[in-house]
Amino acid sequence: MVKSPLKTEPNPQLDNVDCLILMLISMLAFIIRYWIIFHPNGCVFDEVYFGNFSNFYIQSQFYYDIHPPLAKVIAFVFANLSEYDGSINFNNAPVYPKPDYVWLRLVPATFSALCCPLSYLSVRFCGFSHTAATTCALLVIFDTSLGTEGRHILSDGILHFFAILHICVLMYTFSIKNYGLKFNVWHVLTGISLGAACSCKNTAWGLMPLDAYLYIVSFLPLIQRSYLDFFFQLFVYGITLFLVQLLVYIITFSIHFILLPFSGPGTPYLPDEMKRQLINNNQATSALWASRVRSPGLLYRTFSITLHMHR
């Protein structure tokens, strides 16, 4: 078990003051995100896209988007739980015909509100005071752009949640004093949270330099033993972090493809071999369903659609 001289303080312990502050911060965050969430009652900005994405999932029709699908899959799951039937036409909705849009807005609003207590915990795990952590959380709560994006049918609230969750897990991981089993478990959780963020939007890949910096600085004392130990540990932790992250990314796309078996508006963007795996609604025969499990597989489809996103 390797002990880093950079970690001279014990693991951060949350106290009763932290619990009280977290409750107050969470209440304030949810009040601001939920306040008059039904206004305006018409389509705002990119709700025209993300509202329709939920419709396509409900109708199982394949669609195309430049971003990975995790945030949209989560929105679809909660839309299903609210019994939304996918009937709102977001393409032409100056006024929404039914109040179901409120349930769709509550999903990103909830995830956006959870960013505030997570930001508090991230700062505390860095070793800062209650005052510093509270200040950080209040800045997140009252940030106009975060509050606005989090109140509408957009993927940004969910992206911000997983990004801050990753930072929180990362900070706690490096607060662990010894590189033992506990550190390795949280190292895997770090990769999972990073993969979840990257599976919402590709901009989250920008978190990787932060991870790299912290791992490099944390392992620097190993140079005193030997350069081989330093580079070996850095390689092992770096490659495992990337592989866990990549696995989450692939699983997310696999779920996306499984949920969308029918041909839809995104079909023309696919290569020919993937087009043949989609089923027409009026021709759902057993032979066509059999084509769904033939080559190419989910792994090929994941990387293929990822490349097509950026053409």
Would you name each region that the model predicts?
Residues K7-P10, P209-R311:
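Transmembrane-lumen/periplasm boundary regions of multi-pass, lipid-linked membrane glycan transferases
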Residues F30-Y49, I250-P268:
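Helix-to-loop transition at the C-terminal end of transmembrane segments
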Residues V44-F45, S145-L159, T203:
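Short acidic/glycine- and proline-prone juxtamembrane loop motifs at membrane-interface regions
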Residues G127, H166-W186, A197, I216-L222:
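Membrane-interface transmembrane helices that cradle and orient dolichyl/undecaprenyl
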Residues A29, A133-I141, T148, L194, ...:
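Short helix- or helix-capping micro-motifs
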Residues H39-N52, F62-V77, D85-S87, V102:
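Extracytoplasmic catalytic/substrate-binding loops of multi-pass membrane glycan-assembly enzymes
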Residues M1-R33, L114, F125, F235-L246:
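Start-transfer (signal-anchor) and selected internal transmembrane alpha helices
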